[in-house]
């Protein structure tokens, strides 16, 4: 059966609008309805489902709510959608009481790693640039 993937996604959106409306639904539920609508055979299902799932994930009309539930974005209030998108993409840092110092520890660890990479072990005053320049000079001396 020759089915266009865009047709599957657009039909999935129509099915969600008419059958599920503002109610959450599972991927399995929407897939079963798409299979029924297009009369997709059991033989063709494995060939279509992976691409459909990928397109489904990429389509901004479908929003993952967690616990295997999805919802159409058109039926969501802005605050509900905004809360989910912020949780998914961590648009702002969230601190809980007693954990404020974790960000400072992270910065200290990053500085230690940078010092290690640049060759600064804290025992001397050489900068990374000075160390690199010294290595270049040593290499030149060895090859002359």
From Swiss-Prot:
PROSITE patterns documented for this protein: HTH_HARE
NCBIfam families: RNAP_delt_lowGC
SUBUNIT field: RNAP is composed of a core of 2 alpha, a beta and a beta' subunits. The core is associated with a delta subunit and one of several sigma factors.
InterPro entries for the chain: Asxl_HARE-HTH, RNAP_delta_N_dom_sf, RpoE
GO-annotated molecular function: DNA-directed RNA polymerase activity
Highest taxon in the source lineage: Bacteria
Taxonomic lineage of the native organism: Bacteria, Bacillati, Mycoplasmatota, Mycoplasmoidales, Mycoplasmoidaceae
GO cellular component: DNA-directed RNA polymerase complex
A GO biological process held by the record: DNA-templated transcription
Positions of the HTH HARE-type domain: 6-75
Name listed for the protein in its UniProt record: Probable DNA-directed RNA polymerase subunit delta
Keywords, in A-Z order: DNA-directed RNA polymerase, Nucleotidyltransferase, Transcription, Transferase
General function of this protein: Participates in both the initiation and recycling phases of transcription. In the presence of the delta subunit, RNAP displays an increased specificity of transcription, a decreased affinity for nucleic acids, and an increased efficiency of RNA synthesis because of enhanced recycling.
Homology family: Belongs to the RpoE family.
Signal peptide: none
């Amino acid at each position: 059966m020759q089915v266009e993937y865009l047709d599957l996604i657009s039909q999935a959106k129509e099915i969600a609008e008419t059958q599920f409306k503002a109610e959450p639904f599972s991927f399995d539920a929407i897939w079963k309805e798409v299979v029924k609508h297009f009369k997709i055979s059991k033989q063709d299902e494995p060939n279509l489902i992976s691409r459909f799932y990928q397109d489904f994930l990429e389509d901004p009309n479908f929003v993952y709510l967690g616990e295997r539930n999805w919802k159409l974005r058109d039926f969501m209030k802005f605050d509900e959608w905004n809360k989910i998108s912020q949780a998914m993409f961590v648009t702002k840092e969230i601190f809980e009481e007693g954990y404020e110092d974790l960000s400072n520890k992270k910065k200290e660890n990053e500085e230690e790693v940078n010092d290690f990479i640049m060759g600064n072990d804290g025992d001397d005053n050489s900068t990374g640039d000075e160390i690199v320049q010294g290595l270049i000079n040593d290499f030149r001396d060895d090859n002359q």
